Each structure stands twice: as C-alpha cells, then as structure tokens.
C-alpha cells in the first residue's frame, strides 16, 4: 500500500506551515504502508499542475492532503470540495481569482472518499480535538482537494482521498490570540488518520 501525504509551504506572512512541519516528521512507513511525503506550493496554478502528475507517477492507494486553517481550534476533516477558486487574499504568486472554476465543465463538487466520521471518532478517542468540516473554503486548499478527487474520478482509479485542516501550532500563536495545537499532537493526528483510513 502507498500513501501520498502532502502539506503546504508557508503563506499569508507565516514563516512556517504546520501542515508540512507535521508531514515531514512522519516515519517513512505506517501500518505496513509506504508514505510518500510532498510539499505543495500555495498557488492555484501550482497545485493544479503538480497534483495530477504526482498521482499518475506515484499511483497511491490513499491520498491525504493537509493544510493550515489558522483560527480553527481543532483538526477538521473536510467533507466536500467545490469547483470554485475565489479569494481576496493573494496566493504565493500574487493571484486573486474571483468566482473562477478550477476545471471548466467539471462537476460542481466532489465528496471526500476518506472515512471522515471514523477519522473524527478515532482522533477523539486519541484525545485529539477533531470535527467534520463542511467547507474547505475557496482558497488553495479547496483547489488541491478538488484537483485530486477530480483526477482520481477521471482516471477511474479506486484511490481514496480527502483533506485535513490543522490549526496554528503554538509558536505561530505567540503574538496573536488564535487557537493553537502542539506540533507533536498534529503529527500524532496524522498517524491516527492514516491508520484509520487504511483500515476502512
């Protein structure tokens, strides 16, 4: 079994991105599955170009995308990705799309194919705050999730995929009153998510 797990580069003035910091601290194998770890650019263009190529090249059984959602207090497992790019905050190339489709003529939305409720249950049993989220937004995280699910659907693959949002880690919240989580907890959460998804 192969698991493609990704995190993002820093964005929005942050010096680190907890999603990638946690990914790179994971072992190379979990529950007998090989982990393929990749950092993604925080650009609408970049994720649409890179992710389909990654999926074709690595042929993973499972894709777990992760990203930072500063302000959220817990690990959130995304239910759905929508075919929209819309943001007043520029991506890392300075691009601010307005009501643009990710892919012309593609479906309006895709649901995650990860066991989202089982993941939340397993995280809570591990004493990690978690919830299902019904919106991944319309920024690059949603674009990444939609791109992966669309790529898998078009190719007729049986790969399971979804997106996990994580809070700021403590060092990011030193100068701003935002919820935060220990990086070690985020790493543990990723391990729980991978194991739960592999069992589904």
Curated annotation (Swiss-Prot):
Source taxon at top rank: Archaea
Catalyzed reactions per annotation: Release of an N-terminal pyroglutamyl group from a polypeptide, the second amino acid generally not being Pro
GO cellular component: cytosol
Catalytic residues identified in the record: 78, 141, 165
Annotated localization: Cytoplasm
Main location: cytoplasm
GO biological process per UniProt: proteolysis
Enzyme Commission no: 3.4.19.3
Keyword annotations of the record: Cytoplasm, Hydrolase, Protease, Thiol protease
Short name of any one Pfam family annotated for the protein: Peptidase_C15
Listed PROSITE patterns: PYRASE_CYS, PYRASE_GLU
Molecular function in Gene Ontology: pyroglutamyl-peptidase activity
Keyword Hydrolase: yes
CDD domains assigned to the protein according to its UniProt record, in alphabetical order: Peptidase_C15 (cd00501)
Enzyme's top EC category: hydrolase
Family affiliation: Belongs to the peptidase C15 family.
NCBIfam families named among the record's database cross-references: PRK13197.1, pyro_pdase
Oligomeric form and interacting partners: Homotetramer.
General function of this protein: Removes 5-oxoproline from various penultimate amino acid residues except L-proline.
Protein name as catalogued: Pyrrolidone-carboxylate peptidase
